[in-house]
Swiss-Prot record:
Identification of the protein by name: Arginine repressor
Record family assignment: Belongs to the ArgR family.
Function: Regulates arginine biosynthesis genes.
Pfam families listed in its UniProt record: Arg_repressor, Arg_repressor_C
Gene that encodes the chain: argR
């Protein structure tokens, strides 16, 4: 993959107006790139961690996440987490668009030892289920502390 192709690909995704892989293929071909097909675009989307999210016009488009590395407890994740709340059964975490699965993966890796039975993530919302042996208020405080300390 050439540096020019990579740069053009990233610039296209930053425009947040391409909803399908075929649209990206066509746009790159119009810029003069040859040998571009859907499977190559699919590999590039995976390689660069692209996600589908809603743009300002509420259209589903491909874009690059701000944070491309795999999250860990020392990553600056606080800016991806917008709100943490709970009811008697679940903790709900609201994130920036496209960040929920990354945050959920981090929480799943922390796991049962910290009181997390499992997570379910959408695009910008995570449901966290506590283990039975951990009070929900205590788990909520642990999760909030995790994101406060990651700046």
């Amino acid at each position: 993959m050439t540096e020019n192709l990579t740069r053009a690909f990233k610039e296209l995704l930053n425009q947040e107006r391409f909803g399908s892989q075929s649209e990206i293929v066509d746009a790159l071909k119009k810029q003069g790139f040859t040998g571009i097909n859907q499977s190559k675009i699919s590999r590039m989307l995976s390689k660069f961690g692209a996600v589908r999210t809603r743009n300002t016009k509420m259209e589903m488009v491909y874009c690059l996440p701000n944070e491309l590395s795999v999250p860990n407890t020392s990553s600056p994740l606080k800016n991806l987490v917008l709100d943490v709340d709970h009811n008697a059964m679940l903790i709900v975490i609201k994130t920036t668009p496209g960040a929920a699965q990354l945050i959920a993966r981090l929480l799943d890796s922390i796991g049962k030892s910290e009181g997390i039975l499992g997570t379910i993530a959408g695009d910008d919302t995570i449901f966290v289920t506590p283990t039975n042996n951990k009070p929900i208020d205590e788990l909520l405080q642990n999760i909030q502390r995790l994101f406060e300390n990651t700046l």
